[in-house]
Amino acid sequence: MHASSAAATALVEYSDVSSEDFSDQEAGDLDADAGKGAGNIKKPKPAPDNQFSKGRLDAKPDKEGYDNYRSRRAEDSSDPVAAGSRQTSSSEATNPREEPSQASNTSKDELWGREIYMSSDSIDTDELEAEMKRQKRKKQKKEKHKHKSKKKSKKRKKKRAKSYSSIDSMSDNDINALLDRRYTPPTAPSKSNERTVSAAPSSFTPHNLKESSSPATPPPVRRPNTNSNYYGESSLETANSALGSNLQVTVTNKQSISNRLRSPPPSSRSSGNGPRFGNSPRTPPPSHYSSSGGGGVGSGSVVRDSRSSRYVNSPHKEDVSAHHRSSHDHGYQGRYSGAGSSSHDTRKVKRLSPELDRYNHQPSTPPHKRRKFSDGREVGLGNFEHSRHHSGKYERYSRDRYSRRSSRSPSVQHSRSRQSPSGGLSSGSNAFRHGGSHKHKYGTTVSSTPSHTTRTSKRASGTGTSGDRYSRSPRTSSRYMESSPPSPVGASGSHHYHHRRSPRMRQRTRGDSRRRSPSSASSESSASRSRSPTSRDLKHKREEYIKKISETSLFAELVKDRHKRQKALKEIIERQEENSNSNSNGALTINDNSSSVDGNTPNAADGRSAPGSGTPAAASTTSNGLQALGSKPDLDLNNIPMPNKQNDSVVSNPASNADVPDSVAQLKQPLLVPPFSASKNNIKPKSLTSLPLPPGMNVLDLAGARSPSPGQKKESDEKNVTSSGSANKSVLNLPMPPVIPGSEELSGDDDVIDSPEDFDAPAVGTVHGHGGGPGTTRQRPVILNRRDSRNNVRDWGERCVDVFEMIAQIGEGTYGQVYKARDHHTNDMVALKKVRLEHEKEGFPITAVREIKILRQLNHRNIVNLHEIVTDKQDAVEFRKDKGSFYLVFEYMDHDLMGLLESGMVDFNEENNASIMKQLLDGLNYCHKKNFLHRDIKCSNILMNNRGKVKLADFGLARLYNADDRERPYTNKVITLWYRPPELLLGEERYGPSIDVWSCGCILGELFVKRPLFQANAEMAQLETISKICGSPVPAVWPNVIKLPLFHTLKQKKTHRRRLREDFEFMPAPALDLLDKMLDLDPDKRITAEDALRSPWLRKINPDEMPTPQLPTWQDCHELWSKKRRRQMREQQESLPPTVIASTKYQQHGATMVGDA
């Protein structure tokens, strides 16, 4: 029980299905079965589907019979021996052929009953209750292994009857139909024929297909007789029946009772929407996806048929495949119908013939697990699992329901999951959503379920989508099917998860099954017997599985994040770069967990690849040329021997079942040609992210395409041309797809995952890199550096403000205070700009959002640098609870211009002013070039440190503007009033960079006169003050002024002439010229920041070479400090005589300041 709950939890952890599905009544019922034992099974609620409800109604007498039987047993507890014999006779009577597998259970039941009876002196009420409980526990254990789910127990009698009816030997027609199937995998399916009815896109790519690759829906099964006859659909029905019957001949005596007798009537299977159970263990239900999108009952077997047709090299092989398929069909029945011996079926079938068993472990062998998931709860679970036309609406429903149910119910998963996809449909189908990587994710998921799934399934099939990428060579697939057959993308999809499960889980589940019941024990024994023909293979597989346990769990956790794959590519590139540097001979070393770039190359050299197939390896590629990435679970990824690229033969690594890593470096291999030459029209080069080619692109277009990485492609192209030309379409030799301009564009922000599919893609680029020579090693580090710089940003918000020591408040903004602080870690001084979130309704201040957003896009030496963002809480929960504050961490600047000018502690000369203006205009010009308007330039926002460096700060009002759309209005209330240009004062909303130039002109004048040029407290008063110096805004000097909204409301008492040059005649002529141009009333005539930098006054100014101004290093002069100081001086002056106050009036060069007049 505990193992079951743990398994359910583990599956839930890695499943994409929302946890709310556990509240589903059916899921709850299933959980109840697991918790209370099958003995407490309640009457099931009506099935959601009509067919199922019908089937369940038919099976209801069976359920009632069981309930009565249990009640009778309770009443007859005084005669436990009789009860045990009754139970035994009941099971034996229904299925006399199952005696070998049930005998042990029966005898144990009788012994147990006798012991109870003998140990009890008298049968009183307490003993009766205790005995009832013990019987329930025993029954629970026994039925858990049988997967006697609530909804399945009703179907037992019918299934038995149907099983008996279908145990006839194979008819000649069936045998002919079986033998007529293709025994050699055809060439890779063409895009148009890839799927007949399935609703998914024609080219199945795990990463891209959202619909077909959704968690609940495995890839479509394809037609065996079309171009893509890997994926047989139309011909599956006949093949299924034929194969199934053939299988029955072999397995009939060894099949367990519960498995065989639980399939619904054949009539129910004949319809596309019928139940998911096969009529009998031997006859897989026909495939219904070809005819309808509804739940094909025998989709499990259908998939197997199509797989066998694709990969079987001979009728003999196909028969074997059929056997496995059939047993899987029963596995499905048994999985949810409570048959504990479906596992017997598979194992025994394998045990029948060592020769056949050899093929059982080849990739061509269809997975043993599919049928197990047949639950009967919903229409066509098998179909839902194997057919992709359900991908849309049904996949979601099935995924939610079945994945949870199967994972939660130990009974359901117990021995059935051994033959079914990872203990839960969702795990199988979810795999497809994640593409090749799903195998890892769900492999782990499955491993967490306490079931026998790992046993047979480990050999059973390759991974769904990834199954396609491996050839059928027995060696490569070995026993694990890790390089599972190039199964129809959907066929093995749900299977491989099992075989990915860790041996640890396998052992644990075995223990669970043995503890659960004698029948479970018997199935265990049968399983061990069935594995005997390949015991050495299994031992080898277990050893490798043990090595992969940690990797599997890591894959399952990391594959969830799509972006992490891209990071893996980068890491591989980095490692391979190192390898290329270290290996002077050019040998290519693949990353630890990387699997082969080309899953087919070893098979090309492998003599055991399908004889009838001209393109054995090509068969294992999907129609879009991408190999399914999932079926590499058991590669010894840490010790993949890499041959020298100078080797002329492919050296495969049978010990690790490495289909390919060995041939990765062999760019000039003639052996690579056969796998791809025949299928070159269907195969497209694999992109770095395993994505399909863009619309309208095909392999021929890319054959001579140049790689986006110039250094690499130069020589790799030569290699491609010299080796096999366009015929050699190996992934190793194909050019980079134009969609992705080289790995340089890959995002480096993501964490690294060790998913084999991720290593395949990068290997493409790295192969070119090795071919290209050392030039590539110079390019790659750039990516890593870029990634590092981005990663720094990801730390924002992770630190607490406690790492800083607050020293003093130096300012106050619209949304918080500004503090001077010291970083404890680096001992650097920083400025912390606090962002208060106390106004919850308003949310995060838009000014702060803009500042953060814009500063992240600006990088200039004259623009303040935003280091990071910190919070004042230790964790997010605390922050959310208390509505804390954010702090923007800036580099610290000792002063601002306002504080310096008002302090009276500095006396900037012309050279200092020129340096300040040059730096200010340099930063402003950078902003304007980036199409940003600052919109708040004033002295307090111009920062300066003690070294004389000037930086533009406070981008809270800044915004991006569209230089091409001058008609777009922006807010008019920007820029501090004293620095606001006349167009804004007159209501202009369609403004541009000229507003910032006006503000800079005000600062230029202020540098020379030591106080603001235009001081007023209202907009019209401000405009009047400007008019006194710069002249009145009239159409004669400003033609467009009449278009401004407030022009006609302007009631000036008199028209002023421009007297700027007269008032500022003390300024140097070049500086005065610049001031005159910057303070032009007409924004269209106003000088730009770029032109101002070229002005005679600033053209030759280099701030770095100029002497540092004499600044008060003992005092930080900021606006806040200046205001406090001014207040104190005012208070002091109020106590002084009026003559003293008058003497403090400031005049320079004999010019009375504006505002004093």
Curated annotation (Swiss-Prot):
Q: Where is this region: Disordered?
A: 15-540, 574-661, 675-782
Keyword Nucleotide-binding assigned to the entry: answer is yes
Protein kinase domain residues:
804-1098
The enzyme's E.C. designation: 2.7.11.22, 2.7.11.23
**CDD domains listed in its UniProt record:** STKc_CDK12
Q: Return the broad EC class.
A: transferase
Q: Does the keyword NAD apply?
A: no
Q: Which UniProt keywords apply?
A: ATP-binding, Chromosome, Kinase, Nucleotide-binding, Nucleus, Phosphoprotein, Serine/threonine-protein kinase, Transferase
Give GO terms for biological process. Answer: positive regulation of transcription by RNA polymerase II; positive regulation of transcription elongation by RNA polymerase II; transcription by RNA polymerase II
Give binding positions for ATP.
810-818, 833, 891-896, 1118
Q: Where is the composition biased (Basic and acidic residues)?
A: 55-76, 315-332, 392-403
Q: Which residues form the active site?
A: 936 (proton acceptor)
As one GO molecular function, the record gives: protein serine kinase activity
The cross-references to Gene3D superfamilies, in alphabetical order and at most eight, read: Phosphorylase Kinase, domain 1, Transferase(Phosphotransferase) domain 1
Low complexity: which segments have biased composition?
Answer: 163-176, 256-281, 408-422, 473-484, 518-533, 609-623
Q: Which reaction does it catalyse?
A: [DNA-directed RNA polymerase] + ATP = phospho-[DNA-directed RNA polymerase] + ADP + H(+); L-seryl-[protein] + ATP = O-phospho-L-seryl-[protein] + ADP + H(+); L-threonyl-[protein] + ATP = O-phospho-L-threonyl-[protein] + ADP + H(+)
Q: Which spans does this entry mark as compositional bias, Acidic residues?
A: 18-32, 746-760
* Chain intervals with Basic residues compositional bias: 134-162, 495-508
**Any idea what job this protein has?**
Cyclin-dependent kinase which displays CTD kinase activity: hyperphosphorylates the C-terminal heptapeptide repeat domain (CTD) of the largest RNA polymerase II subunit, thereby acting as a key regulator of transcription elongation.
UniProt record similarity statement: Belongs to the protein kinase superfamily. CMGC Ser/Thr protein kinase family. CDC2/CDKX subfamily.
Q: What is this protein called?
A: Cyclin-dependent kinase 12
| This protein's encoding gene | Cdk12
